[in-house]
Amino acid sequence: MAAKDVKFGIDARNKMLRGVNVLADAVKVTLGPKGRNVVLDKSFGAPVITKDGVSVAREIELEDKFENMGAQMVKEVASKANDAAGDGTTTATVLAQAIIAEGLKAVAAGMNPMDLKRGIDKAVVGAVEELKKLSVPCSDTKAIAQVGTISANSDETVGTLIAQAMEKVGKEGVITVEEGTGLEDELDVVEGMQFDRGYLSPYFINKPETGTAELENPFILLVDKKVSNIRELLPVLEGVAKANKPLLIIAEDVEGEALATLVVNNMRGIVKVAAVKAPGFGDRRKAMLQDIAILTNGTVISEEIGMELEKATLEDLGQAKRVVINKDTTTIIDGLGEQEAISGRVAQIRQQIEDATSDYDREKLQERVAKLAGGVAVIKVGAATEVEMKEKRARVDDALHATRAAVEEGVVAGGGTALVRVANALREMTGDNEEQTVGIRVALRAMEAPMRQIVANAGEEPSVVVNDVKAGQGNYGYNAATEAYGDMIEMGILDPTKVTRSALQFAASIAGLMITTEAMVTDLPKDEKMDLGAAGGMGGMGGMGGMM
């Protein structure tokens, strides 16, 4: 086991604080509408230019191991805020730095760190309650666009695109961000249920100009097994032919004789038909087939529940207004399912989302809800260069998360105003003893730090602005973009309550742990001389050239 280097008390805390300051100082220059860029060197390719706090934090690794521990703990604050709300990483870092710096001063003055931490925790609980009181619901398109704009660093086109996407696919809809091919940002909305399985044979194509198979008012047969024997399909095919409607078959697979017969029937015009594989695998496939059945008012033909394909009738088939199939995807538009059944299914999946333990499962379940309830929107980010594309995509992702958070828990006045109001409301709060009260004061003073940093980045004097805002009431704050005072919500400067709350809670949590740190342990650096000494005896090999 390698020897360890141990530091105690004030030495340990000072080293840790130095690391915190290096990371936080690099991150906080990006805060606010007039925040600066940070350039990150990459081992290959062009440097990355970013205004995204968490991207800057992730790149920072310090040489001194004790300082690095401090930096890594604050990096954790940014990551946690990013995971919880998708934004607010820079705010969380600024808050953490302020609480740690003030807290360590109090510890150096001889205060009990545990009581300080209790005071900080008490202030945060009170602050979260105050934030809830200040929060305003965010439901209209204009407010959603404003939140998106602020989070995308005042890029109005991004805010508007996200608002349009949410309007089209609903609050629950899936919105994904992709890299586009042009210079302009685009919004692509897929209505209805789309899954990533294409036609099983190109002979099903009936629109050669678009390379798609399109079926109008089709019956939809859902089968939870492989179909290879055409005899099993004959009763359904005959019924569909009599009804003079097209047929879509969604099965685990359709192969051999069954597929060949379907192709021949389709080409001869006897029955207009197309076949695709069912989406997903294993239990997820069964669940998704059931989703499609509910959406189209059909029944999944499954031997597990004693149903045989040969005995299927037209009553077992689902129906939709239209189905479009290309080589990669199938889209079912306007399924004829009953709204009540669809709502029940959505509620059931939402319950599963709450119980899910892994992010992957949660994401897949969320997609299923979106496909049943709304649709899927794709925002294609346009840019002139690769470097700009990466930077812009990160901003759009942030903005999307922020708008989701805003819809979830509402919005508060932006620009750090809400936290200043909260600190003002709690100024009479006291702890169980004097040291807890000092902890409360540390947290309340730190709540002014985001506004101070936004103002400093805009080139103004932070103390003057903070005092002016404190003198005001409600949503009165300072708009750093226009250098004007006024009602922040009316000016469209909004922050999602969830983002502000998460930033404060995570910052206080990690800062509290760091204030109560008394010792730090790390590996001693290895002695390089020893390693070189072992190879020293090889020096004489140079003379072997004469032996050739």
Curated annotation (Swiss-Prot):
It catalyses: ATP + H2O + a folded polypeptide = ADP + phosphate + an unfolded polypeptide. One of its GO terms (biological process) is protein refolding. PANTHER family: 60 KDA HEAT SHOCK PROTEIN, MITOCHONDRIAL (PTHR45633). It is found in: Cytoplasm. Its main location: cytoplasm. It comes from the Bacteria. This is Chaperonin GroEL. One of its GO terms (cellular component) is cytoplasm. Signal peptide: none annotated. Its EC number is 5.6.1.7. Belongs to the chaperonin (HSP60) family. ATP binds at residues 30-33, 51, 87-91, 415, 479-481, 495. Gene3D superfamilies: GroEL, GroEL-like equatorial domain, TCP-1-like chaperonin intermediate domain. Together with its co-chaperonin GroES, plays an essential role in assisting protein folding. The GroEL-GroES system forms a nano-cage that allows encapsulation of the non-native substrate proteins and provides a physical environment optimized to promote and accelerate protein folding. InterPro entries: Chaperonin_Cpn60_CS (IPR018370), Cpn60/GroEL (IPR001844), Cpn60/GroEL/TCP-1 (IPR002423), GroEL-like_apical_dom_sf (IPR027409), GROEL-like_equatorial_sf (IPR027413), TCP-1-like_intermed_sf (IPR027410). It holds the Pfam family Cpn60_TCP1. GO terms for molecular function: ATP binding; ATP-dependent protein folding chaperone; isomerase activity; unfolded protein binding. Forms a cylinder of 14 subunits composed of two heptameric rings stacked back-to-back. Interacts with the co-chaperonin GroES. Keywords: ATP-binding, Chaperone, Cytoplasm, Isomerase, Nucleotide-binding. SUPFAM superfamilies: GroEL apical domain-like (SSF52029), GroEL equatorial domain-like (SSF48592), GroEL-intermediate domain like (SSF54849). It comes from Proteus mirabilis (strain HI4320).
